[in-house]
């Protein structure tokens, strides 16, 4: 097997340039469709946002989300910046999240609202009440 030296971000750029109008990502349950170019633009926008809040190469970024379009966007945006992706189990309770954030040295936590009996936003507000005002 031959390896190459392109990063995930470089592959995304490559396909966005060579097949910009070809459909890349479909979330049929949400009626969302992205071409390579559209998805790359979405990723670049997210990467700029992450960069603006201090995410850079080597920064640990947690993703606490279900299978939603933003999960993949965060993955690629972090990869373009050289960040370290830390996936968070969607079933975690607050004490498990607190341990993981500390143990994995998570700088930035990207979240969705939550699933089943857990509200991710409320758990984070309980851990860091000052975020409610920011």
Residue ranges of model-derived segments:
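Structural core segment of the AMP-binding/adenylate-forming
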Residues: 81-134
């Amino acid at each position: 097997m031959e390896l190459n030296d392109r990063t995930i971000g470089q592959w995304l750029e490559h396909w966005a340039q060579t097949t910009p109008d070809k459909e890349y990502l479909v979330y049929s349950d949400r009626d969302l469709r992205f071409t390579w170019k559209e998805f790359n633009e979405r990723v670049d926008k997210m990467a700029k946002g992450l960069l603006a809040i201090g995410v850079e190469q080597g920064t640990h970024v947690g993703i606490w989300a279900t299978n939603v379009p933003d999960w993949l966007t965060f993955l690629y945006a972090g990869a373009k910046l050289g960040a370290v992706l830390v996936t968070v189990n969607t079933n975690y309770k607050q004490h498990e999240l607190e341990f993981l954030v500390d143990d994995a040295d998570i700088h930035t936590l990207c979240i969705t609202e939550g699933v089943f009996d857990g509200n991710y936003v409320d758990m984070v507000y309980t851990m860091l009440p000052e975020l409610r005002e920011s």
